[in-house]
Amino acid sequence: MKTAFVFPGQGSQKVGMLQDLYNAYPIVKKRFEEADEALGYSISKLCFEGPDTELVKTANTQPAILTASVACYEVLKENGFTPDIVGGHSLGEYSALVAAGVLNFKDAVYVVHKRGEYMQEAVPLGKGAMAAILALPREQVVEICQQVNDTVGSVQAVNFNCPGQIVIAGETAAVETAAEKMKEAGAKRAVMLPVSAPFHSRLMEPAAARLKEELDKIQVNDANIPVVANVTGKILTNASDIKDSLVTQAANPVLWEDCVAEMVNFGVTRFVEVGPGKVLTGFTKKINKEMELANVEDIPSLEKTLEFLKGVR
């Protein structure tokens, strides 16, 4: 009977997130103040007041979600609950690494802000795109990407989220062509995503190289809680392996389905999504229907999850 804490990635942000927890818990306020200090501008104000047009910029979204997620984790910890294993989706992996003692919180806030900047600068606006492909088998998605790659331009599968949901990314024309072909091949839907860059695609390689320079400047520790890496779907605890996997992750697919399978294999029966939204809860439900699921993003969900965790002690 083990518990995993999992941390969300980009797309889960919303103006007003964490406001009630910020008002109720000094530790939440402290984390937001530390984030403001690390960034040199008020991410708190952006989270609570917006505007949304600024919050959705990846260089802001990334530190905002990381701060909100780590703050939720601190509240669980203050209440006496810690996980047996952690993982995070894309950006969420950094939140998981703070929880596992691998990264110092303020370092992580600064690094993900830079990660956002570098990802945005790697591909000019409008030149890259992402699309979610629903209900088409993994093999077919990969095969069509390969065909389009050989004829139109760079495109690849970049998020294996759960059965029936895979995200592709690359050059805009190639992504549009691949999405069209996937619909013809029987995909239930192929939806272009409102993102500003083709995250986790090969086009992010310049960002990965610059990210490595940032990671080289900060302290990276061995994990004190096992962490499941996005790029392999396997457990890592060694500092240098973790650092390498973060660099690789910027320009390679997120194997979320494999990450969840690894946690289940580790003995996990309960997943708690720590941070804004319930995206990962939805994925987990589709990957394994046997799991008990909870989340923490505000006071009502926190109270419910504390009851749930007390009940299974």
How should these model regions be labeled?
Residues Y22-N23, Q147-N149, K183-A185, K286-K289, ...:
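Short, solvent-exposed amphipathic alpha-helical segments in soluble enzyme
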